Structure formats: structure tokens, C-alpha cells
């Protein structure tokens, strides 16, 4: 039976049954064959030298394609397992995967785990296996054969139970692994790899399952790829908010309490408090009414909103109160804000009605997905909802967008882009059923962007079921795109909760609900800022804005304490380092803690009513009059936060008085 193969250019050719991707590639050109590593048939990766199963659309995957790198790393994970089995015959295996930047394999040993010190030995064994260049043989096992092959491995047996029949695998010498992924046709190209680290991971990501040991590595087609990867990892480590958070004592996670439940230390709590006060003041000034709503709610609320039907896997189990009442930790704040809207009869004169809250939420995140402050189980969202008439959408959208960009400016966030998401015009039946509302609202959002003369990407088919949206994507410290802010129109929740307002005509009308997040959750935003600033927070955000160091406590401490008092009165965050340590040590420690200003006071400064100031990152110090330094610092803080409450010169008295 012939195979009808359609190529990316639309050409269709027939090939005999049993033809491989390799045979087709070699028939196209030798240069392509040298780079090819796999195929993609109707969107699914297929092995390079196995018979093509059926007719379809075929793409040749090469070393230049992302899929090619995935195949390389899947092969590296397989060889890692083979090396581990050779070194530790008693080892059990979970699953191995290629990742965005490498690969891993989950393992378990009864007789002691593999440590990071063992990785050079394991890598040497991998390199020896690769050097032998033994054939990677595809194998097909019946379920019974697979059970026999993995009879001593409890985790592989679970995978076999969940798999179909027959089961695909690969054989390398005496080593056989249950492997439905595509591997390289041979090991000759697997030359540039490195094992990186060891960490714990629950089996299948469930905390109720055994903790396995995850061995991480990476692989590239060239040595340069490995070198560039090492540089990126070093840079990532220097920006990693988890490392910086530990070094600057911002937050910690206690396993006795639970993963994904961070404790905010005084330094981190100060940063968070400054941001929270800032954002609340910004929103109130922009017409929002700030509220507090319960973190618990009756489960029926989330059934009405649809969260229980569509997001149940992300919600914690309900709490049965024993009297028929079921309470739920809220996964989102919008149903609570709807209750506030619905608490009164609303008039068109009240619209737009803007409600905002720093609302605590809970998400049922698997332990394997948790990461520092970026992925947590308890979070506080800078959340807001506006209720508008349909003809107010465009102006309100612009108002929200201006607020977002104003906040970005204060935090010096300059690298961002806009993505406007519409419904799919060819598949409208999967969206909320109101063509006129969709047409008008999408036109309004586009009109608002054009009015503000902003560049944006239009993404058809990416809108939510219930309305179009705008995502604002910022660049992380490592140059990756991350959605920071969202403006989302919602036609569905007003219907579900029967929201109305009385119009000019005296009749009831349905409002449009606009969800908007300015900076997302406090946890994720502070993680982002920590990495962007590399821990060197701008003065207005820094937990300690200045440290004062007397040269001699007996002679200079009284003067230093007077300076401290004036700075505290001015609303600044300042500490005195009067420990019995060497001056150089104190200054170095202040720099290590990334405190914006280190202020030293000795005889000259005392006599001149002055201070010697060293800015973080500078090598030199400058002498300034004490009053002028404090005024300049107050002005700097005011400039970052635009709070306007203290004018330079108002906060200080003559320090020599």
C-alpha cells in the first residue's frame, strides 16, 4: 500500500509502504540528510529511521529546529538512565524528559541516593556509552512483556499500567527503557552534554507520592552551545530571586509549614508594604474604591461563577462545615467584587464603577510547579474590576492602560509590548454568544490602542470565551517574555450573576465587566523586581535606604543618632551600625546588602555638621552637608514614588543645633 506524503510546499508524492524519514530525506539532498534527525507527521514527531505509519503531512526535523534539540535531549536522558543502571544496578526509574533548557531523569535508590558529587562519575559513564556508539534499537513490547521487563521497578510498572498495548521502547546493549518519545538514530551526535544538579521531585508531581531524586543535565549540538548555556546559567543565578531573597533576607519557605507558602522577613515585608501602599494610593487617585472581601466563600458562589466547573483542578478541596454548608478558599477575587456591585441597585450615573483590592487567593499548585515567589499556593493579587456600560468600554480601557503605563514608569519598567486578543472569526460558536457585543468591544479596544498611538499585535483566536483582552508582556531579567498586566472584558459573569443597572430610560441594562491587573500578584511582582534590579532596589523601595556608621562610638555616635532621628522624621528608613567591627568590614557588608547609601561620620563630619556618603556601587565617597543629604534623599524617594507629600527642605532642621 502506497504512502501519500504531503510536503510543506504542498507537493504530494507517493512512497512505498515501509518508507522511512531517512529514505525520503536522502532522496531530497545529501546536505539535508546530514542535518536531519527526525520527522513530524501530521504534527507528531516520528523517528528518523522507523517506517512511516500512514499517509500525511511530513516535515523533516533538523538540528536547526527546536524539535531537533528536543530529540537530542530526549536521547541524552535515555543515555543518562543507561549509565545510572550500569553504575547502580539497584536503581529505580521514574520518567525522563527533555525540557526547554536541558533534560532530567527521576530516580530512586534504596541503598543511598546519587549525590551532586557523583555527577562527574555518571557523566564519564555516559561519555563512555556514547563513544561505543552502540545502536539504539526500537523495541515493541506487549503489556505482559513490559511487566516482565520492569518487574523490579515500581514506578515503571505504574507507567506500563497506564500505557496502551503494545508498548514502545528502546534498547541500548542490555538496557531497555519504556520510551514512547523519539530518540536520535544513533549516538554519534550526542557529543556536547553536561550533568548539572540534583534535586527532589515527587513522583508524578503529587506530594502524597514518594519523593524521587531528579538529576538534571543539558545537551547541545556544539561546544559553543554548552558554553553559552553556562554563561546564561551563571547570569540566571546572579539574578535568581530565590538566591537574592536568601542573601538579602527577604523571604523564606519552611518545609514544616508547607511548600509554596512564603514567610516575608522584615526586609521583604518592607518592600511589599511600600508597593502595596503605593498601588492603593495610585488606584484611589484614579477613581477606584478599595475594599476588603473574605478569603473564604460558599462553594455555590464559585459554581455560579463557573470557576468550580472550569478551574476545579486549581482549587483546594471544599471544607464541609457539617451543616450542609461548603466553604471554599477563593481562587479568584472577581465573584467577591460582583457581590459588592450587587449589594445595591445601581444607576447609570454610578458607571464606571471601579472596585479594587489587594485580595488574597489560593491555588492548588502541584509541588513540582512551585518556585520561590513566582509560583506559590497563597498569593495576594493587585486586582480590580470596573463595571461599565458598553459605550464606555473604549474610554475606560484607555484610562486603565494609562494607569498601567504610569505605574511602569515609576518602577522603571520600559521594555514591554502589547498583545490584543480577539475571538476566532471562523469559529465564533465557541465564544460567548453576542455578535454585536463582540464586534463593538473589539473595535473599541482597537480604537483605544490607536487613540493612544501604541503599537500592538492582534491575535485572532486567543480571546477568552467571555471576551477580548489585552496582555502587556514585559521582558524578564533574562530577556524572556512574561505577562505582567491584563485588561480583560467579560460579558459572561454579568449574565451569570444577573448584574444590572438602571439606565437613563428607567429600564434595566446589563453592564460589561472589565477585569484588570496592574502588577499581578505581590509575590510574582516582587520576584520580577528582585531579578530586574538584581537585589539593588531603587532608594524608594529599598528596605534600608541608608546605613549610618560612626568612626568612633564614643566620639561620634550621639551625632549619628541625631542624623538618624532627622531621617526617621523625614520618613526615611535608616539604621545605625555601631557594632565593634572594623570600618572596612562594615562598609563592605553594607555594599553586600545593597543598601543605597552608606554614610560615615568622623571628626571632620562632626565639626562640619556633614556626612561622608557612598552610593551603592560607587568606589568613592563625597562629603555633603547633613541637611542637604537628607533633603536630596527625600527628593529622590519622592521622585521615584511621585507621592508629593514631602518637599525638599521641609523635613530637616540644622543638624548642628
From Swiss-Prot:
Annotated EC: 6.1.1.3
Domain of life, per lineage: Bacteria
Cellular component annotations (GO), alphabetically ordered: cytoplasm
GO biological process: threonyl-tRNA aminoacylation
Gene3D superfamilies: 3.10.20.30, 3.30.54.20, Anticodon-binding domain (3.40.50.800), Bira Bifunctional Protein, Domain 2 (3.30.930.10), Threonyl-trna Synthetase, Chain A, domain 2 (3.30.980.10)
Main EC class the enzyme belongs to: ligase
Cofactor (UniProt): Zn(2+)
This protein's UniProt keywords: Aminoacyl-tRNA synthetase, ATP-binding, Cytoplasm, Ligase, Metal-binding, Nucleotide-binding, Protein biosynthesis, RNA-binding, tRNA-binding, Zinc
Signal peptide positions (record): none
Occurrences of domain TGS (ranges): 1-62
Subcellular location: Cytoplasm
Catalyzed reaction equations: tRNA(Thr) + L-threonine + ATP = L-threonyl-tRNA(Thr) + AMP + diphosphate + H(+)
Positions of the UniProt region annotated as Catalytic: 240-538
Coiled-coil boundaries: none
CDD domains xrefs: TGS_ThrRS, ThrRS_anticodon, ThrRS_core
Function: Catalyzes the attachment of threonine to tRNA(Thr) in a two-step reaction: L-threonine is first activated by ATP to form Thr-AMP and then transferred to the acceptor end of tRNA(Thr). Also edits incorrectly charged L-seryl-tRNA(Thr).
Family statement: Belongs to the class-II aminoacyl-tRNA synthetase family.
Quaternary assembly: Homodimer.
Protein name per UniProt: Threonine--tRNA ligase
Organism annotation: Lacticaseibacillus paracasei (strain ATCC 334 / BCRC 17002 / CCUG 31169 / CIP 107868 / KCTC 3260 / NRRL B-441) (Lactobacillus paracasei)
Amino acid at each position: 500500500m502506497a504512502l501519500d506524503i504531503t510536503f510543506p510546499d504542498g507537493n504530494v508524492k507517493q512512497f512505498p509502504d515501509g518508507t522511512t524519514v531517512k529514505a525520503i530525506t536522502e532522496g531530497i539532498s545529501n546536505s539535508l540528510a546530514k542535518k536531519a534527525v527526525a520527522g513530524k507527521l501530521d504534527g507528531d514527531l516520528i523517528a528518523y529511521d522507523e517506517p512511516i505509519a500512514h499517509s500525511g503531512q511530513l516535515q523533516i526535523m533538523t538540528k536547526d529546529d527546536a524539535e531537533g534539540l528536543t530529540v537530542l535531549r530526549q536521547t541524552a536522558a535515555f543515555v543518562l538512565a543507561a549509565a545510572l543502571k550500569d553504575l547502580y544496578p539497584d536503581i529505580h526509574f521514574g520518567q525522563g524528559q527533555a525540557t526547554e533548557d536541558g533534560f532530567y531523569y527521576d530516580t530512586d535508590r534504596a541503598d543511598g541516593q546519587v549525590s551532586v558529587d557523583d555527577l562527574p562519575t555518571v557523566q564519564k559513564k555516559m561519555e563512555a556509552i556514547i563513544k561505543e556508539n552502540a545502536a539504539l534499537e526500537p523495541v515493541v513490547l506487549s503489556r505482559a512483556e513490559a511487566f516482565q521487563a520492569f518487574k523490579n521497578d515500581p514506578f515503571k510498572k505504574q507507567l506500563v499500567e497506564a500505557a496502551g498495548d503494545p508498548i514502545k521502547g528502546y534498547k541500548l546493549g542490555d538496557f531497555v527503557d519504556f520510551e514512547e518519545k523519539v530518540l536520535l538514530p544513533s549516538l554519534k551526535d550526542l557529543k556536547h552534554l553536561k550533568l548539572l544538579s540534583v534535586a527532589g521531585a515527587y513522583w508524578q508531581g503529587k506530594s502524597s507520592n514518594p519523593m524521587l531524586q531528579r538529576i538534571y543535565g543539558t545537551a547541545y549540538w556544539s561546544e559553543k552551545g554548552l558554553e553559552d548555556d553556562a554563561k546564561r546559567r551563571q547570569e540566571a543565578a546572579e539574578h535568581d530571586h530565590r538566591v537574592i531573597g536568601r542573601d538579602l533576607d527577604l523571604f523564606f519557605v519552611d518545609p514544616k509549614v508547607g511548600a509554596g507558602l512564603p514567610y516575608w522577613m522584615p526586609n521583604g515585608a518592607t518592600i511589599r508594604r511600600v508597593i502595596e501602599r503605593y498601588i492603593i494610593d495610585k488606584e484611589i487617585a484614579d477613581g477606584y474604591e478599595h475594599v476588603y472581601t473574605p478569603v473564604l466563600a460558599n462553594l455555590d458562589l464559585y459554581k455560579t461563577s463557573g470557576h468550580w466547573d472550569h478551574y476545579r483542578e486549581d482549587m483546594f478541596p471544599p471544607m464541609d462545615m457539617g451543616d450542609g454548608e461548603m466553604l471554599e478558599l477563593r481562587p479568584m477575587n472577581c465573584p467577591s467584587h460582583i457581590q459588592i456591585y450587587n449589594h445595591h441597585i445601581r444607576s447609570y450615573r454610578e458607571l464606571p464603577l471601579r472596585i479594587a483590592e489587594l485580595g488574597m487567593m489560593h491555588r492548588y499548585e502541584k509541588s513540582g510547579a512551585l518556585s520561590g515567589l513566582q509560583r506559590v499556593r497563597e498569593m495576594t493579587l493587585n486586582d480590580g474590576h470596573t463595571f461599565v456600560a458598553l459605550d464606555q468600554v473604549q474610554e475606560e480601557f484607555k484610562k486603565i492602560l494609562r494607569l498601567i503605563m504610569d505605574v511602569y514608569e515609576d518602577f522603571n519598567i520600559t521594555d514591554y509590548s502589547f498583545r490584543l486578543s480577539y475571538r476566532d472569526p471562523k469559529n465564533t460558536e465557541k465564544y460567548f454568544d453576542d455578535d454585536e457585543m463582540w464586534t463593538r468591544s473589539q473595535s473599541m479596544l482597537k480604537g483605544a490602542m490607536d487613540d493612544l498611538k501604541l503599537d500592538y499585535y492582534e491575535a485572532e483566536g486567543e480571546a477568552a470565551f467571555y471576551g477580548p483582552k489585552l496582555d502587556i508582556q514585559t521582558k524578564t531579567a533574562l530577556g524572556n517574555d512574561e505577562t505582567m498586566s491584563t485588561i480583560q472584558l467579560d460579558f459572561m459573569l454579568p449574565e451569570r450573576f444577573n448584574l444590572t443597572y438602571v439606565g437613563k430610560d428607567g429600564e434595566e441594562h446589563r453592564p460589561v465587566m472589565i477585569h484588570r491587573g496592574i502588577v499581578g500578584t505581590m509575590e510574582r511582582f516582587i520576584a520580577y523586581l528582585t531579578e530586574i534590579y538584581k537585589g539593588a532596589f531603587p532608594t524608594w523601595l529599598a528596605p534600608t535606604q541608608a546605613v549610618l556608621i560612626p568612626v568612633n562610638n564614643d566620639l561620634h555616635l550621639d551625632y549619628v543618632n541625631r542624623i538618624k532621628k532627622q531621617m526617621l522624621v523625614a520618613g526615611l528608613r535608616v539604621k545605625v551600625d555601631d557594632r565593634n567591627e572594623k570600618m572596612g568590614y562594615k562598609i563592605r557588608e553594607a555594599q553586600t546588602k545593597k543598601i543605597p547609601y552608606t554614610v560615615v561620620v568622623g571628626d571632620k563630619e562632626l565639626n562640619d555638621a556633614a556626612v561622608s556618603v557612598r552610593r551603592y556601587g560607587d568606589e568613592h565617597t563625597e562629603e555633603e552637608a547633613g541637611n542637604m543629604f537628607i533633603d536630596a534623599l527625600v527628593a529622590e524617594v519622592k521622585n521615584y514614588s511621585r507621592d508629593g507629600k514631602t518637599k525638599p527642605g521641609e523635613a530637616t532642621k540644622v543638624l548642628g543645633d
